[in-house]
A protein has these predicted regions:
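Structural/interface elements that position substrates and couple domains in central-metabolism enzymes
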Residues: 1-308
Length: 308
């Protein structure tokens, strides 16, 4: 019931933002996102904190959302100064410790102005253990947006980095995990990733493309972000390498094999299969004629099972 928006002192927006790809060129689509904000702005009351938690491209809050809200609120003879607009991105880890990952972790935030930032700070202090996990306030909402996108791009690139070393070590029979554990003793390299199936989930598969999309669509710049784009391509192809490893090391042809896949979700202890690397793996194995058996304790399987 959208009428409840009128009663809220704080509205937290966590609506997915659509992005599509044409010839690997990311294109942002704000239509459904702004449509939702239009519904909110039609009911929001004066003095309400509107907190954007969605991971959005740099510049979205200041260049897209703020002007849009100004126009929408104007229809009610209200102004942007009548509400508090802020951005603070999620830092959560879905799974067994989901709630703890919200309360017991550092958060970054910023507001459209100092009053909005203050209201955002006061709200975050009610849900986060800021004594042990102090808040970090940035100078602008664009800086806060950039922090989230850069944070996830760094992680995606770190995962992509290990792919070529996985192939190299495999080709000359090296134990890459043993090598990585030796490297991780050095504190500056403690976050190097282990080999895996690839990147999955809603965030790391798309967030690295937000920067090039924002550069072109929002700021009208021609910064290409080649490294970020390459990381996405490498990660998308990782499951295909696993198929090749199976073909090279199996005594049986893939087309005649019964293969049990244990674990379909993008990470442990969740039921979310969105953009799971396992989906790419299963699809390619089926293309090659394998008979696939799927098992995941967090999912229900049936004739109409769909990845979602």
């Amino acid at each position: 019931d959208t009428n409840h928006f009128a009663d809220a002192d704080i509205i937290v927006v966590d609506i997915p933002l659509d992005i599509s790809y044409l010839d690997e060129d990311p294109k942002l689509d704000f239509s459904s996102f702004l449509e939702s904000l239009s519904v909110i702005s039609d009911k929001i009351k004066k003095g309400c904190l509107l907190l954007i938690e969605t991971t959005v491209p740099p510049g979205t809050c200041e260049e897209i959302i703020a002007p849009f809200l100004r126009d929408e609120l104007g229809k009610r003879e209200m102004g942007l100064e009548d509400i508090f607009l802020a951005h603070s991105y999620e830092r959560v880890m879905p799974g067994e410790n989901y709630l703890a990952s919200i309360r017991e972790y550092w958060r970054v935030f910023s507001g459209l102005d100092e009053h909005s930032a203050l209201e955002c700070r006061k709200f975050l202090e009610t849900i986060i253990d800021t004594v042990n996990y102090p808040l970090t306030e940035l100078k602008s909402m664009t800086a806060s947006e950039t922090a989230k996108v850069m944070e996830n791009t760094y992680r995606a690139a770190n995962i992509a980095f290990i792919d070529e070393w996985t192939k190299f070590a495999s080709s000359i029979q090296l134990d890459l995990i043993e090598i990585i554990e030796a490297i991780k003793i050095r504190s500056t390299h403690s976050n190097i990733m282990l080999p895996g199936l690839g990147v999955g989930g809603y965030c790391l598969t798309k967030d690295p493309t937000f920067a090039p999309a924002a550069s072109k669509q929002i700021f009208k710049k021609e910064i290409q972000f080649p490294f970020s784009r390459l990381a996405v391509r490498v990660n998308n192809n990782m499951p295909l390498h696993v198929v090749q490893v199976l073909e090279d090391n199996s005594s049986k042809k893939i087309s005649n094999a019964n293969i049990l896949i244990c674990g379909l979700t993008y990470r442990p202890d969740v039921s979310d299969t969105r953009y799971s690397a396992t989906e790419i793996l299963v699809s390619r194995l089926i293309e090659k004629g394998a008979d696939i058996i799927l098992h995941d304790p967090h999912l229900s399987f049936g004739k109409n099972f769909l990845w979602k």
